[in-house]
């Protein structure tokens, strides 16, 4: 028996955020900037003003092929293809107006992925056998208005202002905060899972499930920060021109080409994660009405971080940056391993009622901090850690599922408590740790 199913779809969504007229210039009151004696250039967004500018569209398809190979084995293959295109932003600034923003550079998103998966399941005597695997390929390209960086960026004057003279460290004029970020992410992920489980033909006094899970993920990301509002990017007067921003020799780079002079900073990073997990659970029938289930998952993962953060400068100070393989990150993999457990007791006093208690552990993998161990501008602050560990949860749950009033009322009730420790948080602090 063979069956094929296809679903094709497209959805166009109108916007609801207005990009309204506005102007922007650097604030002479900011401690990062030269002060009121310096000339500041203003930027306006007249070319980008638009009502309901955050429209989007989704389109794609899903194809499935299911086949019964014989009395014991079935095969399912599925392929998904989807593309998202979106403009604008989906939040707003209450200080500007209800559902209104002032954006000074284009905001666009193109997000496309394909995923192919296969599931083979069957029976071998007293065992039910399952294999499932998938491959994901995703490409995301995005433009982001980064003009808000002008409010806090300590290094912005260096990039967009002019020195008063060749020997003076003060600035005579500053360009505008027209900063555009170009994001390019490539993500590949491959997963495999193989499991066996006892079935009703087993004569063992308990039932069980056991298996192995393998996960390999690759993320290649490029973020290019374009300072389009620089006062004199080509040089002029006593101010030396920008130099072409080229990759660090010997450092890992997905894109080995030199960037334009307006691309004053970029990240070209490779992150990989490989995980192998073994899992199993056993269910013991204590009585006809009471079952105990005990499970565990032992995982081991290697996490890698490579690449570079590249800065472009002026004059003889041609280039600088961070080669993460040669720096504190090194070439060693970050290894994390542990075992998490689960216990469930279930009690069925009758055919219509189930009481249960569960205690389970969970985790989220750790990783590398790109700005790890960098010295903050404020000496009272600590440097970010080089790596961060997994955060962990312990979940406790008590619940009941029952039918009442001769089956006319269903009741599901649960009490739960989650203890979450070593919580992972992110911090964007360009004033103290510029990454």
Walk through the language-model features, giving the residues of each:
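Transmembrane beta-barrel wall of Gram-negative outer-membrane proteins
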Residues: 1-86, 112-114, 187-188, 199, ...
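Face-selective signature of the C-terminal outer-membrane beta-barrel domain
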Residues: 78-80, 113-140, 176-313, 335, ...
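Membrane-embedded beta-barrel scaffold of Gram-negative outer-membrane proteins
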Residues: 119-124, 128-146, 348, 354-366, ...
């Amino acid at each position: 028996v063979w069956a094929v199913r296809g679903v094709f779809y497209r959805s166009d969504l109108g916007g609801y955020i207005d990009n309204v007229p506005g102007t922007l210039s650097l604030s002479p009151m900011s401690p990062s900037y030269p002060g009121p004696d310096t000339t500041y250039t203003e930027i306006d967004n007249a070319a980008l003003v638009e009502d309901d500018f955050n429209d989007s569209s989704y389109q794609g398809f899903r194809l499935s092929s299911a086949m019964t190979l014989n009395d014991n084995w079935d095969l399912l293959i599925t392929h998904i293809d989807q593309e998202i295109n979106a403009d604008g932003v989906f939040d707003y600034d209450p200080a500007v107006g209800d559902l209104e923003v002032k954006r000074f550079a284009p905001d666009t998103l193109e997000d496309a992925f394909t995923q192919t998966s296969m599931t083979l399941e069957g029976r071998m005597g007293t065992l039910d056998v399952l294999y499932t695997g998938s491959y994901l390929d995703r490409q995301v390209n995005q433009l982001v208005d980064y003009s808000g960086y002008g409010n806090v960026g300590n290094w912005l004057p260096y990039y967009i202002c002019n020195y008063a003279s060749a020997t003076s460290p003060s600035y005579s004029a500053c360009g505008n905060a027209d900063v555009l970020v170009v994001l390019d992410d490539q993500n590949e992920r491959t997963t495999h899972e193989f499991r066996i489980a006892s079935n009703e033909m087993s004569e063992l006094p308990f039932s069980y499930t056991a298996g192995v899970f393998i996960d390999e993920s690759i993320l290649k990301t490029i973020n290019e920060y374009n300072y389009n509002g620089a006062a004199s990017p080509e040089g002029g007067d006593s101010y030396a021109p920008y130099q072409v921003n080229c990759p660090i020799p010997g450092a890992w780079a997905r894109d080995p080409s030199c960037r334009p002079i307006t691309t004053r900073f970029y990240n070209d990073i490779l992150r990989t994660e490989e995980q192998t997990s073994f899992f199993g659970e056993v269910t013991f029938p204590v009585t006809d009405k009471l079952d105990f289930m005990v499970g565990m998952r032992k995982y081991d993962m290697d996490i890698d971080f490579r690449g570079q953060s590249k800065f472009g400068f002026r004059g003889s100070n041609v280039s600088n940056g961070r080669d993460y393989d040669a720096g504190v990150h090194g070439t060693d993999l970050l290894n994390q391993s542990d075992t998490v457990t689960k216990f469930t007791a279930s009690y069925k006093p009758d055919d219509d009622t189930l009481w249960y208690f569960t205690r389970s552990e969970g985790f989220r993998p750790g990783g590398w901090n790109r700005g790890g161990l960098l010295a903050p501008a404020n000496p009272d602050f600590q440097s970010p850690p080089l790596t961060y560990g997994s955060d962990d949860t312990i979940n406790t749950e008590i619940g009941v599922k029952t039918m009442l009033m001769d089956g006319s009322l269903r009741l599901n009730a649960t009490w739960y408590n989650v203890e979450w420790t070593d919580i992972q948080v992110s911090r964007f602090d360009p004033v103290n740790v510029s990454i």
